[in-house]
Amino acid sequence: MSSVSNIQLTREEGFICTLLDDVCHWMQASNPSVEVDGQVHTYKDLCIGSDASDQPFSASKITCEARIAGGWVRDKLLGLPSHDLDVSLSSLTGHQFALFLKAYLESDRFSQTKLAHEIAMHLPHRGAIGTIGKIAANPEQSKNLETATTNVLGFDLDFVNLRKEVYEGTHRIPVMSFGTPLDDAMRRDITVNALFYNVHTASIEDWTEHGLHDLHHGIVRTPLDPASTFNDDPLRILRCVRFSSRFGYEIHSDIRSCLCETASDGGSKAKNPSTAELLRSALLNKVSRERFGIEVDKMLSGCDPFRALQLLSAVSYTHLTLPTICS
């Protein structure tokens, strides 16, 4: 895993990152309690791998780590503004962490910190935290993990635990469980969306070993073999096209080869379908029309819809995504 520490935070972003770090330290040191679904639980009760909370507090041994993931990290490195942060937690669900965050912001401990005084000085009219929304896991709407959402200091934050996914048979919806940063990074769509900002070390983490390279060289690449990434969720095929057209990036040759592969060994398509043919079928049969349509709409309403159409044509997906126009 490679890392860099040259990201430039705004003052407000610095407040958010310091706050997330402080909450993790506070939970480890104090073992606070919160009410979850009508029952009171301590941090140790809820935290996966909480045996470390039996030990005296040490900043290097916090059990719950917080990382900002995905689009915000990518956009910061590209010098683009972003006010939506996805926070990944190592050992609490998103909703549990959000409840502890709210409890910390309302505690005497926080009110006495330097951070609280700086926030009061520079952001006097911003509420510390808004209402916490809980979005339950809902496979019907492609929400595979429970997520919490709230507004903190003017930023929209989504909280979810690091995850790994196991897909079974023809079902697109995976079985989910807690994972490592590597598990989580490798399950994402493309490498430039798989970067993390570790709020405890103030550094970018590149667990795929390709994200920073691909960001600097303008490459759309999947963390895993393209066939594996696309089989897990075929909609990622269209996302690759969209991000390529949005940023002017080149689609990696492995993706092009995967999507344009023909039937092997001279066999007929019916008896020996190629990977590309299987992926086209999966995109049509495993992805809802709603998700499909949203992705196509984002392509065509983006900054370079012509490039998106060129890319779709290059991988023979135009008729699949725009049948009415093509006919």
Outline where the language-model segments fall.
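Catalytic cores of the polymerase beta-like nucleotidyltransferase superfamily
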Residues: 1-322, 327
